Amino acid sequence: MGRENILKYQLEHDHESDLVTEKDQSLLLDNNNNLNGMNNTIKTHPVRVSSGNHNNFPFTLSSESTLQDFLNNNKFFVDSIKHNHGNQIFDLNGQGQSPHTLWIGCSDSRAGDQCLATLPGEIFVHRNIANIVNANDISSQGVIQFAIDVLKVKKIIVCGHTDCGGIWASLSKKKIGGVLDLWLNPVRHIRAANLKLLEEYNQDPKLKAKKLAELNVISSVTALKRHPSASVALKKNEIEVWGMLYDVATGYLSQVEIPQDEFEDLFHVHDEHDEEEYNPH
């Protein structure tokens, strides 16, 4: 398959490469001028406008990028979606959101929900350092309630990742300073509760960090399932909750097996009439 045919294939299909350049387009169009009746079938791929080479290649922007560079990237984003879907996606988004999934992940720039290859309007997102979910964090608790009770999501993913800075910090005794030491306390508690298990990985720090990341996902999923809204929805089989780990070196997700929570029923608070109110008198 020649270069011209590869480029033509990319431009005619919905999963075309974002790496098509102006030179590639010119080559493709010149080639198709020699083909009978083919010009009208080609959808011109949006071209990314660049201010020139920057020191962050192959990424699209850098610390030296200007405001106009960011706006150009936004235009490319819009043009790419319209190229594949017309105005349908933005028309639907203009009418409101109805996401099917809540994604709870780490703030790490490498580990966002982009790995699901979804479109705007599909995923409701909450991210923080080390993808921590606990009952003391009003932000995550509010997001979970809103996602389940208002948006009616059907899937919830809690996703950790390899090479997580919050995990590495929790494996160290070095003080970070500011609010971060307090924020990472839940991960340190997980480390303390699994100290013997983690010591088995002392000869391989990367595997040790990966194991703690998995344990942290388990802890966050367990905390999420104990959330009042999640507990009720799970009892009614209205949602599924999955733990995931994203590998920043490969781009692939893997499932983290979540053990059964023996205290799950203790956190199932509800308004059902058959439940007697506790009264010691």
Swiss-Prot record:
* Keywords, comma-separated and alphabetical: Cytoplasm, Lyase, Metal-binding, Mitochondrion, Nucleus, Virulence, Zinc
The record's catalysed reaction(s) read: hydrogencarbonate + H(+) = CO2 + H2O
Q: What class of enzyme is it?
A: lyase
Bilayer-spanning residue ranges: none
**Cofactor(s) needed for function:** Zn(2+)
Q: Which residues bind Zn(2+)?
A: C106, H161, C164
Pfam family of the protein (one): Pro_CA
Annotated Gene Ontology cellular components are:
cytoplasm; mitochondrial intermembrane space; nucleus
Query: What CDD domains does UniProt report for this protein, alphabetically?
Result: beta_CA_cladeA (cd00883)
Per its record, what triggers expression of this gene product? Answer: Strongly expressed when cells are grown in ambient air but non-detectable when cultured in air enriched with CO(2). Up-regulated by MNL1, HAP43, RCA1, and during early stages of biofilm development.
GO molecular function terms noted in the UniProt entry: carbonate dehydratase activity; zinc ion binding
Known regulation of its activity is: Amines and amino acids act as activators of catalytic activity, whereas natural product-based phenols, dithiocarbamates, aliphatic and aromatic carboxylates, boronic acids, and sulfonamides act as inhibitors of enzymatic activity. Also inhibited by anions such as cyanide and carbonate, and to a lesser extent by sulfate, phenylboronic, and phenyl arsonic acid.
Which GO BP terms sit in this record? carbon utilization; cellular response to carbon dioxide; cellular response to oxidative stress; phenotypic switching; regulation of phenotypic switching; symbiont-mediated suppression of host resistance gene-dependent defense response
The cofactor remark states: Binds 1 zinc ion per subunit.
Relate the protein's function as given in its record: Catalyzes the reversible hydration of CO(2) to H(2)CO(3). The main role may be to provide inorganic carbon for the bicarbonate-dependent carboxylation reactions catalyzed by pyruvate carboxylase, acetyl-CoA carboxylase and carbamoyl-phosphate synthetase. Involved in protection against oxidative damage. Acts as a CO(2) chemosensor and induces CO(2)-mediated filamentation. Essential for pathological growth in niches where sufficient CO(2) is not supplied by the host. Necessary for white-to-opaque switching at low CO(2) concentrations.
Say which family it is in: Belongs to the beta-class carbonic anhydrase family.
Please identify the protein, giving its name as recorded: Carbonic anhydrase
Tell me what organism the protein belongs to.
Candida albicans (strain SC5314 / ATCC MYA-2876)
Classification lineage: Eukaryota, Fungi, Dikarya, Ascomycota, Saccharomycotina
